[in-house]
Every structure is written in C-alpha cells, then in structure tokens.
Amino acid sequence: MRLTKIYLSFTLFFTFLSAQQDTKPEIKIDKELKSFVVDIMGKPFKVERNQNPEHRLKNSYTKTSRPCPPFCVQPFTPVKGIKTIGELELIKFMQEDMSENRGILVDARMPKWYKRGTIPGAINIPFSIFSKENGEVYIDKILPLLGAVKKGKKWDFSKAQRMVIFDNGPWCQQASLAISNLVKLGYPKEKIEYYRGGMQYWQLLGFNTYKPKE
C-alpha cells in the first residue's frame, strides 16, 4: 500500500511537471514589462516581443558578414562624449521622454531603409541632412524642428530636443555620421544618445517594427 501511494505521488508530480513544461512560455521585455504603447501619428502602437520561442529572422539581418568598407564595425562611442545605450535604456526613453515630448527617436538611415520598417515611433532624418556639404538649406529647415533657434549665423540649442539616434546596427555607419555632423553643427553632446544595436539587435530580440505608410 505504501509503495502504491509513493508511486501515485510521483506520477501526479511528473504529470504536473510535464503540464507546466508544455505551457507556452510568456516572452516579456524584462521581468515586469510585457509590452508598452507609443504614439504614431496620433494612434497608439503596441510594442512587444515575438511570442513564438521558435521564431527566426528571415530578412537581411541574419547576415554575419558584409563588405568593409563601407559596412565596417562601428566604435562603441562614435564621438567622444556621446552616450551609447542598450534596448532597456531605449525603451525607457520611448516611455518617458518621447511620451512627454521631451525627446525624439531618430532613424538616421536613408529613406529606402526606413520604408522597409523602423523602430516604432522613430522619425526618419537621413544622416546626410546634417552635413554642411549639402548646404545650409536642409539644416535651416531641420534644426528648428528639433528645437534649435538660429541667432545670426549661430544656433542656440538650449531648448533643443534630446535625441536617440540609430541605424541598421553595429556594422552601419549612418548613425555615427549623423552624430558626428550634429556635433560639428554645435548640437550639445549631452542631448544625443546612440543606440548602437540598431535595427538588427532590435529584431534579433524579437521586437516588432513599424512600416511607414507610403
């Protein structure tokens, strides 16, 4: 009788354990956060990770090797004094600074990349826009939108937006060039942050993307 009880106890235990293992795991962002919402053109957009544990990327971000140049590995700090952040810091920025209109998320890639999909809530300002080589026309139009005020021939950045800038990933130089160009224009380094992981790391972690409407 005693052996029968022990057998039944173990049977029930392993049945329970098997049922727990068969339950589809929940894939959160961190231990507490499952998802969050950003505003895109006045409409809410839910940001979350792919809930399929077997999910694999099928796009170009699965590639490990690209010709260098131009696709060379970028330094952790593109410009001295610029802070580099990871995904959780980016998400905090999206939840707090972006939602309160204190900051903007900038996709520094060329439009053809941006149109394929971007991090939800990002706006596209190609790195070349900030280059003085392209003349002052673009700069004079873009910087005021970022909160800068032109006084004579100089810019006042005291009320300029805080920015997080990204591109395709650690092998892409577009964000690095955008940051370098902004700093040359006088944009305060403390108001610029670099998300080095870019689109590749964002998608490797299973985060969904937003495809801008044509």
Where are these regions (language model features)?
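Bacterial N-terminal signal peptides
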Residues: Y7-T15
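Active-site neighborhoods of enzymes that stabilize oxyanions during catalysis
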Residues: L205-E214
